Amino acid sequence: SANTDEILDILKENNIKATFFIIKRDDPESIARMKRMYDEGHTVAMHTVSHEYPLVYADLPAYKEDVDGIKTFIDDTLGIDCKFYRFPGGSSNTIYKHYGISDIHECIDYLDSRGIKYFDWNISNSDSENKKYSPAELAANVEEYIGDTGVYNVLQHDAPAKKNTVQSLQIIIDDLKAKGYTFCQIT
């Protein structure tokens, strides 16, 4: 979305590289944004083709098709061998149980067989919740769980409705830099 452009601008101004877990969008604007991410040194990683839980987790063949689809899309678009992935709903989700997958380890085994490493977040700004948080509240949601030391993967979204996430980003960056944190992407 246009929010992605603003996020990329903020990251560039702060000389920060990030990881973007991609949902397949094959329109020209989305492809240009994904190429910009990659060209500016960010890690482009797999998320899902559809983000529709009933489709992704219908059964193991459907899950494999989703993973293969997003991998092929990223690999072919960027000319890379994408090896990083984030589960729709996270790897500890129980959403898959409502559909055809009985054990998330079946999915993990498939990723392992493809040489794909999955990542989860350990802090969220809570922008995926139904509540509409202000930019300051989103930043506070992150800062509440940041300790004095540690490695954190912060979950934030760039969908069109996530304007407050964009507006919270500089607050989060400034606060974490003041605490001595550095930023890096998954590599």
Give the role of each language-model region.
Residues F87-P88, Q170:
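Proline-centered helix-kink/hinge sites
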Residues E52-L78, N93-V151, N164-Q167:
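Alpha-helical scaffold elements lining the catalytic groove of polysaccharide deacetylases
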Residues G89-N93, P160:
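Short, internal active-site loops enriched in acidic
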Residues D9-N15, D26-E29, A161-T187:
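C-terminal domain-boundary segment and adjacent tail
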Residues S1-C82, D175:
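Active-site beta->alpha N-cap acidic-glycine motif
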